[in-house]
Each structure stands twice: as structure tokens, then as C-alpha cells.
Regions:
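Accessory interaction regions appended to the cores of large information-processing enzymes
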Residues: 1-207
Length: 207
């Protein structure tokens, strides 16, 4: 019976995962040469690239190339970009998605026989990894705006609690019936279970 099936299911409750991101804070100039020789054709891909903040934290990356004189043939540009594209899925710091990176391929070299798309993609991935670590990387934590309405007598306790939760109080506005609205920015990770805590701290009178 259906009821028997339900009885055998284990239910695991866990906090939702917070969407952390990784980004960089300064410019980094790197060179990476991917070279392998093992009988027959080898592998060769050589890139010189800069990585810097793009200023757009809603977009993983922006890719540009300014190669002159055919140092890296045009047909390898997509492979270099693919290397960047694959790199931003899991960042070098803690495997969180990467945002806000501008990658520019400006030079490099190739081998008429040994170069391949795979070699240039690998070179770009290694260049990304090396540059990211040098470019003052940081983990971004989502911040949300919070509005709490509590009886005036509880404002001190609530503000102390918000500070403990790494919140930044932006303002306090008196409302009707002896209550105060506290407006704050607070890390999303600190908000799980907050409404329950708020009710217990205010005897059910905070919202």
C-alpha cells in the first residue's frame, strides 16, 4: 500500500545552500605554455593573457582577444575562450562559480604540427588558474536587506543580535503602537531560522 511506502522513507532536513561566488580584485598578467611530446604528434599551446575585474558581477566572464601578427591563429581563439568558460564553473579558491572576470588574450605562439584546440584550451585553463590566485581573489557572500519591526523595549537586543550575525544596521524608524522598524543588510547565510529566533527573542511580538 502507498502508506507502507511512505513509512519507509527517511526525510533529511538541511539548510538551503547559500550561493557563494568567487571573483578577483586586481589585474594579473600571465603566460602559460602547454607542451607535451610523446612520440608522433605532440601537444603545443602557448598563451599570454591578462585577467582583471570586469565590473559586472552578474556575468561570469568577458573574453577579448587583441592578438596581432598571427602569433596565435584565429582558429584557436574559440578554444582559448572555451578554456576560460570551463574555468569559471568552479573557481580555484573553493570551487564556487566565478563572476566578474575580464580575460584578454594578447599574445602567445603555436606549432604548425603540434598545436591543437585541446592544447590551447588547456593552456587557457592553466593561465586562468594561475592568474586568478595572483589577482587578489575573494569569495563573495550574498547580502540581503532586512526589515524587522519590534517593540521599542527590544530594539537593543535585536540590534545586538544583528551585529552578532554580521548585519549592518542602516536605520531605525519609529512606527505605530510603540514599535520600531530596524532596517539592516545581513549575509543570507545568517538568516536561516531567523524568524523563529526573532519570535523567541521578542515573545512572539517581532516580525
Amino acid at each position: 500500500a502507498a502508506s507502507d511506502v511512505y513509512k519507509r522513507q527517511d526525510v533529511v532536513l538541511s539548510e538551503p545552500k547559500v550561493p557563494f561566488k568567487e571573483t578577483i580584485r586586481k589585474k594579473s598578467d600571465v603566460e602559460y605554455k602547454y607542451k607535451k611530446q610523446s612520440g608522433g604528434h605532440g601537444q603545443y599551446g602557448h598563451v599570454k593573457m591578462t585577467f582583471e575585474p570586469s565590473g559586472d558581477l552578474d556575468t561570469p566572464y568577458v573574453f577579448e582577444q587583441v592578438v596581432v601578427g598571427g602569433a596565435v591563429p584565429k582558429n584557436y581563439f574559440p578554444a582559448v575562450e572555451k578554456g576560460v568558460q570551463e574555468s569559471v564553473v568552479k573557481g580555484p579558491l573553493a570551487a564556487y562559480p566565478v563572476v566578474g572576470v575580464k580575460a584578454v588574450l594578447y599574445d602567445g605562439s603555436y606549432h604548425p604540427v603540434d598545436s591543437s584546440e585541446m592544447a590551447f584550451k588547456t593552456a587557457a585553463r592553466q593561465a586562468f588558474k594561475s592568474a586568478f590566485i595572483q589577482a587578489n581573489p575573494v569569495i563573495l557572500e550574498p547580502i540581503v536587506s532586512l526589515s524587522v519591526v519590534v517593540p521599542d523595549s527590544y530594539t537593543g537586543d535585536i540590534m545586538g543580535d544583528l551585529n552578532k550575525k554580521r548585519g549592518r544596521v542602516l536605520g531605525m524608524n519609529p512606527t505605530d503602537h510603540g514599535k520600531t522598524e530596524i532596517v539592516a543588510d545581513i549575509p543570507l547565510s545568517e538568516l536561516y531560522g531567523y524568524s523563529t529566533n526573532l519570535r523567541s527573542m521578542t515573545g512572539g511580538r517581532g516580525s
